[in-house]
Amino acid sequence: MIEPWLYLQKRYGESVASPEDADLIKAASELFVESLPGMTEADYSEHGAAHLRLGYDDGPMYVIEISRLGKATWEEWADQDYENEVCPPRSLQVTEQKALTLWKMLKEKRIEDVRKAFA
């Protein structure tokens, strides 16, 4: 069986391969706690989301994007090039804790649980 890969794309551009729970916690906090010195609303808006991707080289790929305003979006792709969408994206409003829970479920490959959360 081919092992999946997992990447966290943090709010300010840092990419983390095989993130630990601590990486997910920090990324969620960066989204919901906007307290960097010198940052303006426009700066925060420009860097408004982070996402976690779980996938296989030959597909499928799953993505949960979380925005700074608490919008979580679930995407399923047949490939890692974002070319063949399996189903339309689904969204819901989340708190920081719920965002973290969703990311952890994806990290643990609990795809059915994630689907249910977005149903």
What are these regions (language model features)?
Residues 15, 36-38, 83-87, 98:
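Generic preference for well-ordered secondary structure
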